Amino acid sequence: MAAAAAAAGAAGSAAPAAAAGAPGSGGAPSGSQGVLIGDRLYSGVLITLENCLLPDDKLRFTPSMSSGLDTDTETDLRVVGCELIQAAGILLRLPQVAMATGQVLFQRFFYTKSFVKHSMEHVSMACVHLASKIEEAPRRIRDVINVFHRLRQLRDKKKPVPLLLDQDYVNLKNQIIKAERRVLKELGFCVHVKHPHKIIVMYLQVLECERNQHLVQTSWNYMNDSLRTDVFVRFQPESIACACIYLAARTLEIPLPNRPHWFLLFGATEEEIQEICLKILQLYARKKVDLTHLEGEVEKRKHAIEEAKAQARGLLPGGTQVLDGTSGFSPAPKLVESPKEGKGSKPSPLSVKNTKRRLEGAKKAKADSPVNGLPKGRESRSRSRSREQSYSRSPSRSASPKRRKSDSGSTSGGSKSQSRSRSRSDSPPRQAPRSAPYKGSEIRGSRKSKDCKYPQKPHKSRSRSSSRSRSRSRERADNPGKYKKKSHYYRDQRRERSRSYERTGRRYERDHPGHSRHRR
């Protein structure tokens, strides 16, 4: 037993001194200047056990106090959270080192964050899960959630019911993962802890008391109980180990060297020993508190903070606007002026632009209106020409093929007269004779022919013939002498038409001999 204890003490003394950084510090101490690489000086990060000790100003005024929690409520929350971590570690069968690491991380975190803004139970779960991975005894996050669920049922004295895998479970799991990340961020990822358990065994070997099992076990118990206090963020691990041995020896009435005091050999002072012992003894004198009552106090502070923020923004807790007490309140609604009326007599540029457009449109409408059957202006002339052209085109499209062949000359002549009237002067065209039939029926007929179910091929030839006749009439109007020389132009055109009819007739007889016999 003594050999094993000596080996453990030697291993503990040979361990490196690198450990977790102080919460919120994350940098090098004030004495370090940095790291010199070449000609440049870079800032360095020094990770030692001194970084995990908090200064007195942070210990006196914590973030929970700034949120409105009193000191007793904060102390009770710290104790209850550490008790939950210890009980969950026992049910998860974690080693004692892992449970101690989780409690130290819990204490460090809540010296940088408030109990009002962060759930104590969620942070406890996150610390258990993180400590199990740090001490190389990982546990699944589902097991951690089930264990804490079971502890809550035992605390409320309810019948044990398994946790359902519903959306609430998924949300709780995500909250624990976020809490774990938050703990790592606040501690600067410096989460290693140097525990005094091995130091106790080594010091008892030096005092030649390692064979007293009762003294060793009592000192170990005081060490585990001190994890529920904040002594691990106030004092060095060596001082805590000396205080646990001192308190156990006084409790068991075992004399230890006092001239000089034995703890001076290990670098501890009498003031530190007495303060640590007092913290541990206060833990036993504390009354048992109800977690539900503590959670209610935290919720009250949350609501008070939310109301204060809402009043600072000028809103009620429901989000409604606060009414001004100085102005008289009348139940009748106030008439709010439109933005156009509120701007005054000066019109906006957009309204001026719209007014100009309306005036221009009215002028165009007056210019287009016919007076005594004659349209006004050049624009009206061009529109009347386009209408006459459309009216003259529509009958040709709806006409039969035979009629189209006979009327080709007349259409070309009409277009010729139109082109001549355009080129000679800008005088308004003559009014159409009143005896002429209404052309709306012809337009309807052309529309019906267009909407026919089975389109026919002659429609294409109609559009081509009309376009060709228009182009030919324009050529004749531009070059009248060219067509006067060719007196045989229309005669040749009639011959080509007769030949084309003869060709079609022969092809028809060749394809259908019976029909040719019937004609004969």
From Swiss-Prot:
Keywords: Acetylation, Cyclin, Nucleus, Phosphoprotein, Repeat, Transcription, Transcription regulation. It is found in: Nucleus speckle; Nucleus, Nucleoplasm. It holds the Pfam family Cyclin_C. InterPro entries: Cyclin-like_dom (IPR013763), Cyclin-like_sf (IPR036915), Cyclin/Ssn8 (IPR043198), Cyclin_C-dom (IPR004367), Cyclin_N (IPR006671). It comes from the Eukaryota. Residues 385-423 are annotated as: RS. Involved in pre-mRNA splicing. May induce cell death, possibly by acting on the transcription and RNA processing of apoptosis-related factors. This is Cyclin-L2. Residues 456-471 have a biased composition (Basic residues). It comes from Homo sapiens.
